[in-house]
Amino acid sequence: MSKKYIIALDQGTTSSRAIVFDHDTKMVASSQREFSQMYPQPGWVEHDAMEIWASQSSTLIEVLARADIHSEDVAAIGITNQRETTVVWDKVTGKPVYNAIVWQCRRSKAICDELKAQGLEDYIKQTTGLVLDPYFSGTKIKWILDNVEGVRERAEKGELLFGTIDTWLVWKLTEGKVHVTDPTNASRTMLFNIHTQQWDDKLLDAFDIPRSILPEVKPSSAIYGYTRIAGEGSHIAIAGMAGDQQSALFGQLCIEEGMAKNTYGTGCFLLMNTGVEAVQSQHGLLTTIAIGADGGINYALEGSVFMGGATVQWLRDELGLIRDAQDTEYFAKKVEDTNGVYLIPAFVGLGAPYWDPDARGALVGLTRGANRNHIIRAALEAIAYQSRDLLDAMSKDSCVELKQIKVDGGAVANDFLMQFQADITNVEVLRPELTETTALGAAFLAGLAVGFWDSTDELKHKAGIERNFTPQISMQKRDSLYKGWQEAVTRTR
């Protein structure tokens, strides 16, 4: 094999990364660049799309140097990205008409309220699988069209293009030749019919968004175009693309119905592959596209917890109880339990399955005997309790009782958290040897598209489990602990 490597571009909320993988899925080299976060008003979050491109393109150049390889050695590039973040740009000059509006930004709440008043909430859920919320791209696009001078007129003349970050990167990598997205990213816009896999005319009319600005939707594993790194060397295929959480699902090889993964980052994102059926949640979860490849679509149920690792950051930065996130395991293990203390980290409300923006954080069960160790342990347990909430909702929606869950993200290095997650859910927790599963998913999609790997069956033999955590507590204790959590949550709402 003359081409020995795949490069994954992992464009995240705070940094851009590039990782080189070899045929055995081992990491050869990586590069990372952070970029600016902008908060022009309370609740608003923006990025400079040109800075994102500069950071991502520089990591691509740097990672080749670190791996000591040339473009001729690279079979393909795969892309994974922060989802929902919205860019609108001039198709001739390539200049954005406004900063990228980030998925966290809440500025379009009034637009959501207007759409709810028009009675569109149920149609949006049935068509897109999403809740009507500023989180998703559709209302962000509308805000730009309605509020940036001259932009709507230019869009209606066919002068502008829209894209989520995947689309923006492909357009830049191909020097403006390719305007494309994949089903996983399209499914996060609130404009895409996940059943027909088409942009939805009724929603485009309701949002008043011209179809001409939208990208073409192609499979998650396909050759979209070619790029030359820094304008030099041979052309490399851009051949795989998926939103970050779906990419992690694929990187964990959760490719069959009933398989699930939980990513422990700033928040927690739990996705379960539901196969060819788009299961409509009755318990506060999102219905989304898991992957679109091999001529078909697999769907997923998704639940998000707002405060995962961010809860540990709060312990460190606001309370000063720890110096480093890694310290939490040491302190948590110094006590047998939390002494009845529950921390409900509803600092920005509660996500799935509650969707309660007005809930606020609380420490429940404090007594004179409670100490730092109990509070730190309660913070870690809260991450696992919230994931149990999601797992229970998924089991009810899918009628599938999960036996195993694969995990990834920074917090999975915490053995205490992983063991408690297994204990409180009564589910086996599998921690992979390689936890860079988001980037690995993009690499898999690209490699499969160009024949670097023959099939997902081949990939299964390369995916190793570093450790599995099995439930160790009795059902009686599990039920008692979780009942205490549920009672504590009611006090925050």
UniProtKB/Swiss-Prot annotation:
An MF annotation (GO) of this entry: ATP binding
Keywords per UniProt: ATP-binding, Glycerol metabolism, Kinase, Nucleotide-binding, Transferase
Record's keyword annotation contains Membrane: no
Keyword Phosphoprotein in annotation: no
Pathway assigned to this chain's UniProt record: Polyol metabolism; glycerol degradation via glycerol kinase pathway; sn-glycerol 3-phosphate from glycerol: step 1/1
Residues noted as binding glycerol in the record, renumbered to the chain: R83, E84, Y135, D244, Q245
Positions that bind ATP: T13, T14, S15, T266, G309, Q313, G410
InterPro entries to which the protein is assigned, alphabetical: ATPase_NBD, Carb_kinase_FGGY, Carb_kinase_FGGY_CS, FGGY_C, FGGY_N, Glycerol_kin
Residues that bind sn-glycerol 3-phosphate: T13, R83, E84, Y135, D244
SUPFAM superfamilies: Actin-like ATPase domain
A GO biological process held by the record: glycerol catabolic process
Superkingdom to which the source organism belongs: Bacteria
Enzyme class, UniProt record, top EC level: transferase
GO cellular component, one term: cytosol
Catalytic activity: glycerol + ATP = sn-glycerol 3-phosphate + ADP + H(+)
NCBIfam families for this protein: glycerol_kin, PRK00047.1
Family according to the record: Belongs to the FGGY kinase family.
Protein name: Glycerol kinase
Organism of derivation: Shewanella pealeana (strain ATCC 700345 / ANG-SQ1)
